C-alpha cells in the first residue's frame, strides 16, 4: 500500500509544481469578489464587487510595484459588473446594486475610465440586456458580452422579496415560485452582444446555439472564443463547453466536449470559474456549484439545488486537441475572481473561497503542455 501511494504522489507532483523562486505579485489592498477588471498594456485594473466603489491598478512589468487606488468609480457600489479594455481605456457595464428602497436591482449603465488623466465618464448609452452574470472580453475595437440574467425577472424577484418585509412565509413563497421554473423560463440572454466605443453603438452579433448562461468563463484569443459552463438557471450549472470563431459571416460556433468530472466526484458544471491562456494552452480553474444539482434536475426537480450545499473548486483543466483534462489543482478553492492572461501566465486575482470569504491573493499559473506551475 505504501509503495502504491508513493508512486501515485510521485506521478502527481511530476505534472505540477509550486514555484517559490518565480515572481510573486502583491496581495490586493482589500478582498475583491464579484468584481471585475481588465488589462491595459502591462497594467491590470481590478475593482468593484466586495471592493465597494474602488478600483486598483498594478504595473505587472515592475517587480517592485504595489497596488494603487485610482479615481473612485462614480456609478456606486455594485456586484458582477462587466469590464473590458479598448484602445487604452477601461469600460465598465451594468452590475447589481441596491436602489433607494434597498432593493437589489440590475443596472444597465456604462462608464469609461481614461488612465491618462485618471477620470471617469458616464457614457450616453444603456446595455440592451441585463448584465448580471454576463461575461465580457474585447476583440479589435469592440467589447463582446455573453450571457446574463434577465433584467425584468431578476429585478422583480428582489422587489417582491423586499416588499414581503419580515413575512417569512411570503418570502418562502416568492423564493419557491422563483426557483421552481425551467431554465428557458428565466430568459437568460441568448444573443452575443457587442459594444463599439468609437460609435457608442450596441450590436446583436447573433444568437448563440446553446442555452443562455450566467457566470460562464468566456475568453477571446485571436479569432477564437471559448465558453465554459455557467448557470443555465439560478442554482443549476451545465458542464457544456463551446468554441466560436470570428468569420466574415459572423461568429461560427461548435460544441466542445463537456468538462470532465474530477476523480470520485460528479461534474455539476461551474459558475465563476477563472480562465486564460498560457503558452498557447487554454486553462480554466476554480468556480462553484451545488454538487448533486444536475442529478436532482434530471429527476424532475426544477428547484435543482434545493437542500444542497454550495461548493468551491480548485481543479485546473486544459483544452488540447478538442479534449479536456485535469492537469493539477490550486492550493485553495476559488471562484468569482478576475483572471487575465499575461506573459504566458494566467493571473488569478482576488475572488472568493469556501463559505464565500473574499480573497486578496494574486496567484499565477502556467502550463507548458507537460507541467503546471503555480506561483
Curated annotation (Swiss-Prot):
It catalyses: N-acetyl-alpha-neuraminate = N-acetyl-beta-neuraminate. Kelch repeats lie at residues 43-87, 89-140, 142-176, 177-222, 225-273, 295-344, 346-375. Its EC number is 5.1.3.24. GO terms for cellular component: periplasmic space. It comes from the Bacteria. Its main location: periplasm. Keywords: Carbohydrate metabolism, Isomerase, Kelch repeat, Periplasm, Repeat, Signal. GO terms for molecular function: racemase and epimerase activity, acting on carbohydrates and derivatives. It is an enzyme of class 5 (isomerase). Residues 1-22 form the signal peptide. It holds the Pfam family NANM. It is found in: Periplasm. SUPFAM superfamilies: Kelch motif (SSF117281). HAMAP family: NanM. Converts alpha-N-acetylneuranimic acid (Neu5Ac) to the beta-anomer, accelerating the equilibrium between the alpha- and beta-anomers. Probably facilitates sialidase-negative bacteria to compete successfully for limited amounts of extracellular Neu5Ac, which is likely taken up in the beta-anomer. In addition, the rapid removal of sialic acid from solution might be advantageous to the bacterium to damp down host responses. Belongs to the NanM family. This is N-acetylneuraminate epimerase.
Amino acid at each position: 500500500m505504501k509503495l502504491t501511494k508513493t508512486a501515485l504522489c510521485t506521478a502527481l507532483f511530476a505534472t505540477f509544481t509550486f514555484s517559490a523562486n518565480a515572481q510573486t505579485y502583491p496581495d490586493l489592498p482589500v478582498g475583491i469578489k464579484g468584481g471585475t477588471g481588465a488589462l491595459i498594456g502591462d497594467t491590470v485594473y481590478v475593482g468593484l464587487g466586495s471592493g465597494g466603489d474602488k478600483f486598483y491598478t498594478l504595473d505587472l512589468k515592475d517587480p517592485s510595484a504595489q497596488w494603487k487606488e485610482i479615481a473612485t468609480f462614480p456609478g456606486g457600489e455594485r456586484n458582477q459588473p462587466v469590464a473590458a479594455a479598448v484602445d487604452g481605456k477601461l469600460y465598465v457595464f451594468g452590475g447589481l446594486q441596491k436602489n433607494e428602497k434597498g432593493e437589489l436591482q440590475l443596472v444597465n449603465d456604462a462608464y469609461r475610465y481614461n488612465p491618462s488623466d485618471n477620470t471617469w465618464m458616464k457614457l450616453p448609452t444603456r446595455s440592451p440586456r441585463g448584465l448580471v452574470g454576463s461575461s465580457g472580453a474585447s476583440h479589435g475595437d469592440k467589447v463582446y458580452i455573453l450571457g446574463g440574467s434577465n433584467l425584468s425577472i431578476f429585478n422583480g424577484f428582489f422587489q417582491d422579496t423586499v416588499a414581503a418585509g419580515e413575512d417569512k412565509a411570503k418570502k418562502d413563497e416568492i423564493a419557491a415560485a422563483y426557483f421552481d421554473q425551467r431554465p428557458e423560463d428565466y430568459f437568460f440572454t441568448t444573443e452575443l452582444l457587442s459594444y463599439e466605443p468609437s460609435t457608442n453603438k450596441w450590436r446583436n452579433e447573433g444568437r448563440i446555439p446553446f442555452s443562455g448562461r450566467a457566470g460562464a468563463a468566456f475568453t477571446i484569443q485571436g479569432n477564437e472564443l471559448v465558453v465554459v459552463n455557467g448557470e443555465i438557471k439560478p442554482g443549476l450549472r451545465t458542464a457544456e463547453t463551446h468554441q466560436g470563431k470570428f468569420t466574415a459571416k459572423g461568429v461560427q460556433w461548435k460544441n466542445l466536449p463537456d468538462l470532465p468530472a474530477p476523480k470520485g466526484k460528479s461534474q455539476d458544471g461551474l459558475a465563476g470559474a477563472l480562465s486564460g491562456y498560457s503558452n498557447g494552452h487554454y486553462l480554466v480553474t476554480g468556480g462553484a456549484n451545488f454538487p448533486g444539482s444536475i442529478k436532482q434536475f434530471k429527476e424532475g426537480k426544477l428547484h435543482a439545488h434545493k437542500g444542497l450545499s454550495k461548493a468551491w473548486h480548485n481543479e485546473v483543466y486544459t483544452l488540447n486537441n478538442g479534449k479536456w483534462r485535469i492537469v493539477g489543482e490550486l492550493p485553495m478553492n476559488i471562484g468569482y475572481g478576475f483572471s487575465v492572461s499575461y506573459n504566458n501566465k494566467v493571473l488569478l486575482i482576488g475572488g472568493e473561497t469556501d463559505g464565500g470569504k473574499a480573497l486578496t491573493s494574486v496567484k499565477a499559473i502556467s502550463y507548458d503542455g507537460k507541467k503546471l506551475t503555480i506561483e
